[in-house]
């Protein structure tokens, strides 16, 4: 229950909170246990100094990448998710840049269809100054994500240990 609300419709830059919208949309496109190959092209789209999840060229489950986006706020993981989902949306797309662009275009359509009318995103990591959202849209996406037990499990921890498809673990803090 909300007791006080102020400026909830005022546009603001979402920064890393953009990843919440990316995760919400990506979870509608693929199964959490989908195996995603992180390739150099997608990882290299990450802005210098923002690869905090240390995603490597190997296989991850989609839910591993969601955890990497949420716990250490991994921009590298966000690009890998956008690349993977862009490939699902447009299998003929030839480059990582094209797949990420297609994902972002479709994400923005999805946002409008879901009622996030004051949110527009241009970068899956939120590392841009043109994106906009509102506190109201952020509240709605968080409420929607909190319906999922996998999301609650990830965000309830400040350290997350992921089991990768090869059986090895990776820890994010």
Name what the model sees in each region.
Residues 1-136, 145-149:
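Active-site-adjacent loops and short helices of periplasmic peptidoglycan-processing enzymes
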Residues 116-117, 129-137, 142-173:
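Domain-terminus/edge residues, biased toward the C-terminal soluble/receptor-binding domains
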């Amino acid at each position: 229950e909300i007791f006080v609300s102020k400026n909830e419709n005022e546009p603001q830059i979402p920064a890393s909170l953009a990843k919440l919208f990316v995760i919400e949309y990506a979870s509608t496109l693929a199964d959490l246990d989908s195996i995603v190959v992180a390739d150099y092209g997608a990882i290299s789209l990450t802005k210098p100094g923002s690869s905090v999840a240390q995603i490597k060229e190997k296989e991850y489950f989609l839910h591993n990448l969601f955890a990497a986006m949420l716990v250490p706020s991994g921009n590298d993981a966000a690009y890998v998710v956008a690349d993977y989902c862009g490939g699902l949306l447009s299998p003929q797309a030839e480059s990582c840049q094209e797949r990420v662009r297609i994902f972002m275009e479709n994400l923005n359509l999805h946002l409008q269809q879901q009622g996030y009318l004051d949110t527009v995103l241009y970068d899956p990591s939120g590392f841009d100054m043109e994106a906009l959202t509102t506190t109201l849209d952020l509240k709605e996406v968080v409420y929607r994500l909190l319906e999922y037990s996998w999301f609650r499990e990830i965000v309830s921890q400040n350290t997350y240990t992921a089991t990768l498809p090869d059986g090895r673990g990776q820890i994010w803090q």
